[in-house]
Each structure stands twice: as C-alpha cells, then as structure tokens.
C-alpha cells in the first residue's frame, strides 16, 4: 500500500461494503479508518471482519474487539481535526480519503489535503452528494501534476503548494 491509512464514511461503507485492503499488490494493507457516528455499519460487513487493523470513529462508547478499535469523538466539534489528531498519535502519517463525496468535501472544507487523485468517466450522475468544489483561493494554489487516459477514463493528480502538518 502507498499510504499508512485509508478512510471511508458511513454511506460509502454501507453502499459498497469495501475491503480496503491490498489485493494484487505487495506490501501491508493500510489501516482502515471509518467514520461511523451512530455505528450503523453491520457487523457482517468486510470493514468489521478483523482481518486488517480498523479504526472506527463514533460518538458511542464501545469495547474494542480483535483488530477493530472504536474511538469516541465529539461530532459537534471539528470532526476532521479530531480524526487527524488520533491518527497522528498512532504514527499514521498518511491518509488516503477514498470517499464518499461528503467525507471528501469535509477534508476540502477543512483545508487539510495536499494531493487529489481524480478519476472521471463519461457518465453523468444526477443524484447523490456533489463532488468537492474548490474556491478561488484553493484553486490558485493547485497545480496539475499528471494526466493519463485509459478507455474513456481520465486520471489526474493535483497538488497544493502547502504542506499538511499534524495537529499535535
């Protein structure tokens, strides 16, 4: 894996039932990070199978189990900052925010991202959460690093000029 941790929100976890592990690639699987405020993800889902280390951020007090750690945070406060504080305390120095759109928007709005890998396809979606929109200030500091197209899909990598520092 290229990153220390990979994160999804509740809705993406419920809709996709992702594994968030390494497949067809060498190296260790990243730590799985899930934002599940009310603990609505069923125990039968892959994220809770205990095969890989998993951190669940929630508002509930829950006992940990094998390879699944429940971390209680205040959802009335700055959620993203709290998540990053806990990840930094665990020496997890890189985080891939897989999605969904609401979670990605939260990171963009908190201005705590330094690279975006964007995949687009010739498909128009008319429902769901809109993709992140960047304001004029954010756009002025962004550079496009590379573009690649494969079978009607475009892959782009964007970088900001800033460096994200841990909150601690």
Located regions from the model:
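Enzymes that bind and transform nitrogen-containing heteroaromatic metabolites
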Residues: 1-168
